[in-house]
Design a protein with these regions (language model features):
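Class I S-adenosyl-L-methionine
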Residues: 1-134
Length: 134
């Protein structure tokens, strides 16, 4: 998996757009998204202009960004890692991945891609997030 993503990053071929990613297999779409993150053509952290994050900024005066990773076994087919190993059945049933914008395919692709980035490209993940926070 890691080698395929590195090949995508170093390839001169343009990466798939969000609209094009929807037509790919989930695995291919995730690889493409991770490559976008590594090329820094897409942000890892969610925008502080997102409604719920903006509300907190207005209340407390601090810019807030979000980072949603794949919960429990959502990314297991690629990572073989359970991100929520201690989650109860109740927690899994009420997980926020089942609500709001999280239910859409692009959100799922992004969550899994961020999780792959965290697990497989940790130094790069930390550098990217550090740069985005600054």
């Amino acid at each position: 998996m890691k080698d395929l993503i590195i090949d995508l990053v170093s390839s001169p071929t343009p990466l798939a757009t969000v609209a094009e990613q929807k037509n790919l297999s989930l695995r291919s779409a995730v690889y493409m998204q991770v490559a976008h993150y590594l090329r820094r053509s897409r942000k890892v952290l969610t925008s502080p202009t997102q409604y719920k994050l903006l509300k907190g900024q207005k209340e407390f005066g601090y810019a807030t960004v979000g980072l949603n990773l794949a919960p429990a076994t959502e990314a297991y087919f690629l990572t073989r890692v359970n991100m929520c190993p201690s989650a109860s059945k109740g927690c899994l049933a009420t997980c926020l991945r089942h609500s709001g914008q999280n239910i859409f395919t692009q959100g799922k692709i992004a969550r899994i891609a961020r999780t792959v980035l965290w697990l497989e490209f940790r130094p790069e993940f930390l550098a990217i997030v550090g740069a985005e926070v600054r």
